[in-house]
Amino acid sequence: MFQKVEGIVIRTTDYGETNKIVTIYSREFGKVSAMARGAKKPKSRLAAISQLMTHGHFLIQMGSGLGTLQQGEIISSMKEIREDIFLTAYASFIIELTDKATEDKKHNPYLFEMLYQTLHYMCEGVDPEVLSLIYQTKMLPVLGMRPYFDTCAICHQETDFVAFSVREGGFLCSRHAEQDPYRIPVGEAVHKLLRLFFHFDLHRLGNVSVKDSTKKQMRTVLNTYYDEYCGIYLKTRRFLEQLDKFQI
């Protein structure tokens, strides 16, 4: 059965000398994989459409197992991302997280829209690190995780937040922070932004400016929480950490 889907290429795997297995996150079916025969040949009609991060329409012969990519039409090649090493690094982190966090053929139009919108914001010049933090925060419920972002994880009151506790699963107020010796001290902006990122509609994102120190604290909170509860290892995260050392 042939299906036309709108999707974004989130992974490619070489198969033999000339073929690729292309993994697409689609609006209609979620994550699907298909064999792109001859796609590694420079003159192949599938060469461009099967590139990582390409947003397009794909005609796939679907089956119970691996499908076959017949043809495609590019909507956006994400050129702006491809031409910038830092954008490529953050976009690669986002698509790898999407790949590792999802199962095959699990329909989730919300997640497709979030992936699409995030990558297009990157192309438009929005801070890629902030976008990756937003995406990482919004992926938490997709993975079945809901940290205490609105109230203290211990007293459940909306009060002054001074730390994040991985053990308790959320922010801690000044009265209860001492209960976790391994708490992560955070500024007020970290709580406000993570809470905002968790709840707000990504389509309503305007001009956003976040201090480097705040971004660093947010990254520490999210990465530590993911490490404890998620169990997903991302190669791109390590590359981002290495790349950050060279960024002025």
UniProtKB/Swiss-Prot annotation:
Pfam families: RecO_C, RecO_N
Keyword GTP-binding: no
Function in brief: Involved in DNA repair and RecF pathway recombination.
InterPro entries, per the entry: ARFGAP/RecO, DNA_rep/recomb_RecO_N, NA-bd_OB-fold, RecO, RecO_C
Protein name in the entry: DNA repair protein RecO
SUPFAM superfamilies to which the protein is assigned, alphabetical: ArfGap/RecO-like zinc finger, Nucleic acid-binding proteins
The keyword Kinase is assigned to this record: no
Family: Belongs to the RecO family.
Domain of life where this protein originates: Bacteria
Organism name: Bacillus mycoides (strain KBAB4) (Bacillus weihenstephanensis)
GO cellular-component term (any): bacterial nucleoid
Disulfide bonds: none
GO annotation (BP), single: double-strand break repair
Lineage of the organism: Bacteria, Bacillati, Bacillota, Bacilli, Bacillales
Keywords: DNA damage, DNA recombination, DNA repair
